[in-house]
């Protein structure tokens, strides 16, 4: 099976395809609401390239502080710039009011990422409207969203679930990051702001993982047509990023990429997988083979696996980074997904500076501290509805 990975052209007897042609694609990233806006602003500050950014919000004050001039005020008449008040129906009407402006913003895109925090008013209500408009324009549309912490209350959880169901009606694929999973990978000493900063970093890596695959030419190249073939109408999607150095770095990076504690389930059962392997000039063909074998072993035999590789001369630390996007779970007899961990996590530490963390630290859960998670039996029945969340942290 591994030998099939290195065919010079598409091998019709194998579901692993390598392409050499480059298709430039028009990619737009839309941050909807406060949470989505925070994520997009972080992407801009980090220098994510090759994409066009848009911010859409009902809160004019928050919108005016955005890092891009591409901004749309949602519901200028209905909300008068004061936000949606945690009411998704208000967010939905506000987006419908701005239908023409949203259409003009999305027009011409080949692919649109919609990032939002589910559970509040604007992101929850407006994101599905934006996705619907993108679908009507024939754009490949991917949602990258978060779900609220359990302690944010049942109402917010329920609103998030309803909003996510609506979003799924219109996107080709959606990557969901439950905020509760943060409790598995962050220490108790982290502040609320630091914790949400980690969520924004994960959203950044999710978008960057796909945009880099499309926009950065590789030795074994994956283009937009490849991505579209796997992502289009694929339903739920999972994404992981691994990064490792030293002996066995490719295998370790692959294990990290399929061992994501911040996502909702494993890649087992995926019908389509996109893989990008990036390393410095010293990356060897056997390392690519080893990493590919790890990923193949984690998915079904008949899954379509598209692998691209790129050599980045700026990588000077001897590391290899692997991005895995897995899709098509609903196509497998509607079977339910189980939260499963693959492999083992590498040891890592966190010094309190979020900017110095590697994306793989988030996705593999590679931290020394292992606090009790609400997903592991802690009391999740408390309904803290009286907690006020600052506007800039509302997802």
Q: Predicted segment positions?
A:
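Tubulin/FtsZ superfamily GTPase core signature
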Residues: 1-395
